[in-house]
């Protein structure tokens, strides 16, 4: 076997060659290529004239010796037009019911069937056997067929509860295509002079029969790690709970796993990774409603669980809660405690500063930062005389935020423990303490837990960075996963700075 990374590079270059001259069809080409490399079937849904047949024709050039067959179904199509005419000679001379299959579906590696749902029962039944068993019954003989890729297309979905559902279930990959949307791509398409039937693939990139057969065995050796299986099972359980979720057969799940193995194999990996599960968005939907639902559920899985994002946030929440508990425990020990005076008959309780507080200007630290007057405040400077007057007579109190600028009006109070508490506009409070009486930085317990959490985050981010080099996954999905991981990292770093 070639070096895994060399194989991944070759498949990437092969796909780029197949995509030449096709606009906004990269994802479709790549998934059709993946289907061909793993022996699966594809259903293309979309209006006429959007290059569905051209995609199938292009895939023939991925292989050195591939033969292609394409056919437009009508309600009057006969098995002879798809599987080959009867041999009059064999019937006349030997009484054998035998088809001449040369040039027809039974001898083609790449098959494209347009308007597939218009096919009659005789064609559909034979097609089911061809897809399931890769066999074709030709008279008394059962012949093995070489089909590597079946691309079926239509501008509509099969009717529910119809005889077509069995065939539809065999279409593992389902792609919903539309017209070219981007202005520049539309212009390039209009002015392109490329002959669509030319072979765009260099011979050095084309796949030989021997390589294809060897790869089929090696794909099956790709492992499914426990944590990836747990993600798949989580998705399955979540879909089962949703009332509008599509029915996904065990057969479809089984075939989808092989597709994930192929994605890992042709990405140079020896095991399925969480990023491969994004492919399920093109395997599990049934109609427009379920397409959106499946994408939403897989998005939640990828941005919340696949790289332990939600688990790390849960751990962070527990650490922050523990830090708050420790801060609360420390507040009584470190906070500035004022002295309650007598004055039972006075309208207002009076206080005074401790006798050991003698400086003319007092700098008091906030146990936790608050946003006051549009500023993140960590300490406040008071004139001692002003603070003593406020403690004695009440009224307005002002202080310099972070010791700078003009003194600002503050919402200050004395709590039941005789501590000074400053509050912001949302009435969130922070106890004030003298310098040196508040613990420096984070408690060692919290610091260690945050360091361990950050280490785990770095490992998960490194795993994603390594796994995201996957040809078959759209970049916008990778971007959302990266953003989810960066958000977790930012919250961890913010907690470390408190």
Swiss-Prot record:
EC code:
3.6.1.-
Keywords, ordered alphabetically: ATP-binding, Chaperone, Cytoplasm, Hydrolase, Nucleotide-binding
Enzyme class, broadest EC rank = hydrolase
Q: Where in the cell is it found?
A: Cytoplasm
The keyword Protein biosynthesis is assigned to this record:
no
Q: Which domain of life is it from?
A: Bacteria
Q: Which reaction does it catalyse?
A: ATP + H2O = ADP + phosphate + H(+)
Q: Which residues bind ADP?
A: 23, 49-54, 196
Q: Matching InterPro entries, A to Z?
A: AAA+_ATPase (IPR003593), ATPase_RavA (IPR023671), ATPase_RavA_C (IPR022547), MoxR (IPR045427), P-loop_NTPase (IPR027417), RavA-like_AAA_lid (IPR041538), RavA_ATPases (IPR050513), RavA_LARA_dom (IPR046898)
What's an example GO cellular component term for this entry?
Answer: cytoplasm
Q: How is its activity regulated?
A: ATPase activity is stimulated by ViaA.
- Molecular function GO labels: ATP binding; ATP hydrolysis activity
- Record flagged with keyword Nucleotidyltransferase: no
Q: How does it assemble?
A: Homohexamer. Interacts with ViaA.
Report the PANTHER family cross-referenced here: ATPASE RAVA (PTHR32204:SF0)
Question: Which HAMAP family does the protein's record reference?
Answer: ATPase_RavA (MF_01625)
Of which family is this protein a member? Belongs to the RavA family.
Record's function text:
Component of the RavA-ViaA chaperone complex, which may act on the membrane to optimize the function of some of the respiratory chains. RavA functions as an ATPase.
Q: What is the protein's given name?
A: Regulatory ATPase RavA
- What species was this sequence derived from? Escherichia coli O81 (strain ED1a)
Output the lineage of the source organism: Bacteria, Pseudomonadati, Pseudomonadota, Gammaproteobacteria, Enterobacterales
């Amino acid at each position: 076997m070639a070096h895994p990374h060399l194989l991944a590079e070759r498949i990437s270059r092969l796909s780029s060659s197949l995509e030449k001259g096709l606009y906004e069809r990269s994802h479709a080409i790549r998934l059709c290529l993946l289907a061909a490399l793993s022996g699966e079937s594809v259903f293309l849904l979309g209006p006429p004239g959007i290059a569905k047949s051209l995609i199938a024709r292009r895939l023939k050039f991925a292989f050195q010796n591939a033969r292609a067959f394409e056919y437009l179904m009508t309600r009057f199509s006969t098995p002879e037009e798809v599987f080959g005419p009867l041999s009059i000679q064999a019937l006349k001379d030997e009484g054998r019911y035998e088809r001449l299959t040369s040039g027809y579906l039974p001898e083609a590696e790449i098959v494209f069937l347009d308007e597939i749902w218009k096919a009659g029962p005789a064609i559909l039944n034979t097609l089911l056997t061809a897809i399931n068993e890769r066999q074709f019954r030709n008279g008394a003989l059962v012949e093995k067929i070489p089909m590597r890729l079946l691309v079926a297309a239509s501008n509509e979905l099969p009717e529910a509860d119809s005889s077509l559902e069995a065939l539809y279930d065999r279409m593992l990959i389902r792609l919903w295509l539309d017209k070219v949307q981007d202005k520049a791509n539309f212009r390039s398409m209009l002015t392109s002079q490329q002959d669509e039937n030319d072979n765009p693939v260099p011979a050095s990139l084309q796949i030989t029969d021997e390589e294809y057969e060897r790869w089929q065995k090696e794909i099956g050796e790709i492992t499914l790690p426990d944590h990836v299986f747990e993600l798949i099972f989580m998705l399955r359980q979540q879909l089962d709970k949703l009332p509008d979720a599509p029915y996904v057969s065990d057969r479809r799940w089984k075939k989808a796993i092989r597709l994930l193995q192929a994605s890992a194999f042709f990405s140079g990996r020896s095991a399925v990774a969480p990023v491969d599960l994004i492919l399920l968005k093109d395997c599990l939907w049934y109609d427009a409603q379920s397409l959106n639902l499946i994408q939403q559920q897989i998005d939640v899985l990828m941005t919340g669980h696949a790289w332990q994002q939600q688990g790390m946030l849960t751990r962070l929440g527990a650490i922050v809660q523990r830090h708050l508990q420790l801060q609360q425990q420390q507040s009584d020990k470190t906070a500035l405690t004022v002295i309650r005076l007598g004055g039972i008959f006075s309208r207002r309780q009076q206080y005074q500063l401790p006798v050991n507080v003698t400086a003319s200007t007092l700098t008091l630290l906030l146990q936790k930062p608050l946003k006051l007057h549009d500023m993140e405040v960590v300490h406040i400077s008071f004139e001692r005389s002003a603070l003593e007057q406020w403690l004695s007579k009440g009224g307005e109190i002002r202080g310099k935020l972070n010791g700078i600028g003009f003194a600002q009006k503050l919402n200050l109070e004395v709590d039941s423990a005789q501590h000074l508490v400053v509050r912001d506009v949302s009435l969130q409070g922070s106890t004030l303490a003298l310098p040196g009486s508040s613990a420096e930085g984070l408690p060692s317990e919290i610091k260690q837990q945050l360091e361990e959490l950050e280490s785990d985050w770095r490992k998960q981010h490194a795993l994603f960075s390594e796994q995201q080099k996957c040809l078959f996954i759209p970049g916008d999905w990778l971007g959302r996963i990266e953003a989810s991981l960066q958000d977790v990292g930012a919250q961890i770093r913010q907690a470390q700075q408190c």
